[in-house]
Amino acid sequence: MYSLGDDQEAGFKARDSQNTPSLDRARLFAAGPVLAPKSVDEAKKLVDDNVAMNVDIIKIRVDDNLGTTAKMPPDIYKAVIDEAHRKGKRVAVHLFYLEDAKGVLDAGADFIAHSVRDKDVDDAFIAMMKRRNVCYCPTLMREVSTFVYESTPSWFSDPLFLKHVDPKTIEQLKEPARQEQMKNSKQAQRYKAGLEVANRNLKKLSDAGVPIAMGTDTGPPARFQGYFEQMELEMMVKAGLTSRQSLIASTRDAARCQKLDDQVGTLEPNKWADFVVLNADPLADISNIRKIDAVYVAGNKVDR
């Protein structure tokens, strides 16, 4: 699990204790606090603070939340990226708009942490991504979570989902007043439209050879870890990727994108034996990723 932001001390302790052959839980890599500096000087200081925490990557937000907040200006995000690179750290960027994506790439960003959702990507953006071999993490289920609770999702009756979710959370999300509020939310409907753009952009970028890393933005309330990852692969296939491409984006290429491919991502000698055993072929039907027989971490069977 690669957490892109606001990780607490316990997360770093978990990360620092995971390089052991006896590990029987998920691996964790962490970005620490998401940086939101107000000046160039503060940008440098916050980067230095995160580096002192020994974060795995630096995370920033370049987004105005659909026009409701101020966006980090280019001089400041460039200062973050430059300082991070001086200290040997890569930078992941939360964004929404195509022009911001181009701007952060110009500034040297290393990882695009969400889909471009305001418009279709163009040839110039694709060329920038490929020239620097920057990875793109679509987080399609993040968009789904912003509007789907305007009604009761079908998966609320899935036994696999219900096995691990807090029933109180389900009841809250099924409240008629809450669903009506989301249905009438202009922001939710904007993100719903953004999902269609995100789907097209994922397919276009994948076809062009841009490296894709599966991610979901799970963790916040109503973004269900584990289950949303399974749904993300299904969403990627619905967007036009093959089952094989979605699986590679979730394993080998995700590891490559985070510079972890010497440890995980494929089953090879001298790497950790982290893998899932399924009861059906996901290449034949991507929904077969739900048919889990066993999970192994470092070759150890995880108690499920």
Report the location of each language-model feature:
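Divalent metal-dependent hydrolysis catalytic cores, especially in the metallo-beta-lactamase
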Residues: 1-13, 25-33, 53-66, 90, ...
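Alpha-helix-loop-beta-strand connector modules within alpha/beta enzyme cores
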Residues: 16-34, 71-93, 129, 133-138
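Loop/turn elements at helix/coil->beta-strand transitions in domains of secreted/extracellular proteins
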Residues: 23-27, 53-57, 85-90, 108, ...
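Active-site neighborhoods of metal-dependent hydrolases
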Residues: 38, 45-68, 116-239
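Short acidic active-site motifs
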Residues: 42-46, 99-101, 121-125, 262-265
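Acidic, glycine-enriched loop/beta-strand segments at the rims
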Residues: 196, 224, 242-247, 256-292
